[in-house]
UniProtKB/Swiss-Prot annotation:
Native organism: Staphylococcus aureus (strain NCTC 8325 / PS 47)
Recorded name of the encoding gene: hssR
A GO biological-process term: regulation of DNA-templated transcription
Function: Member of the two-component regulatory system HssS/HssR involved in intracellular heme homeostasis and tempering of staphylococcal virulence. Phosphorylated HssR binds to a direct repeat sequence within hrtAB promoter and activates the expression of hrtAB, an efflux pump, in response to extracellular heme, hemin, hemoglobin or blood.
Protein name from the UniProt record: Heme response regulator HssR
InterPro entries registered for this protein in UniProt: CheY-like_superfamily, OmpR/PhoB-type_DNA-bd, Sig_transdc_resp-reg_receiver, WalR-like, WH-like_DNA-bd_sf
Subcellular localization: Cytoplasm
Length: 224
């Protein structure tokens, strides 16, 4: 089941969103502040966060930046601030979507599901290739009795490659699929993620490897 973190200093909004999420079979974890949300994340995995901007202490912009950079969690801003400058700052902070108050909770749920689809978190599927099992629900890799949890983007990148063995993916294709077509960062971030994945696969003694195809991109090979 999808785990959704909702952060807002208004308890009425927290209860309102949580009750509707639960009817849609989405687990809701409500927190009144950015600091409380980060404390929760020390012990609880979530798939997506809905974040207010105007909060005491850590505001929504700061929280969004931390969620994206430290936890790699997709974020939807939910706020009464509708100025273009606020939206610009939110997207610079890393938000995946922006919803203004007052809002229709059904629309918020539509947007949550749309962002989850973009991140491929809407499925509980497992995939096994060689001696490696990938659990998409928990972002876990397993080889024999060894289990490893990955950051979201690393897992989705590996899952995409493993789902199409021997197909070559260019950096541009990977960025569009994993980071989104509007990503403005350095495409070399793909190389960094690939390097980390190779290290993790080696540590697990997986038979799956990620190969570089010179001048083209990356593909996976299973050595059994």
């Amino acid at each position: 089941m999808v785990q959704c973190l909702v952060v807002d200093d208004d308890p009425r909004i927290l209860n309102y969103i949580a009750s509707h999420l639960q009817t849609e079979h989405i687990d809701a974890y409500t927190q009144p502040s950015g600091e409380a949300a980060l404390k929760l994340l020390e012990k609880q995995r979530v798939d997506i966060a809905v974040v207010d901007i105007m909060m005491d202490g850590m505001d929504g912009f700061q929280l969004c930046n931390t969620l994206k950079n430290d936890y790699d969690i997709p974020v939807i801003m939910l706020t009464a601030r509708d100025a273009l400058s606020d939206k610009e700052r939110a997207f610079i902070s890393g938000t995946d979507d922006y919803v203004t108050k007052p809002f229709e909770v059904k629309e918020l749920i539509f947007r949550i599901r749309a962002v989850l689809r973009r991140y491929n978190i809407n499925s509980n599927s497992e995939m096994t290739i060689g001696n490696l099992t990938l659990n998409q629900s928990y972002l876990e890799l397993q080889v024999s009795n060894k289990t490893m949890t990955l950051p979201n983007k690393e897992f989705q990148l590996l899952f995409m490659l493993a789902a199409r063995p021997k197909q070559i993916f260019t950096r541009e294709q990977i960025i569009e699929k994993i980071w989104g077509y509007d990503y403005e960062g350095d495409e070399r971030t793909v190389d960094v993620h690939i390097k980390r994945l190779r290290q993790r696969l080696k540590k697990l003694n997986a038979t799956l490897t990620i190969e570089t195809v010179r001048g083209q991109g990356y593909k996976v090979e299973n050595h059994v």
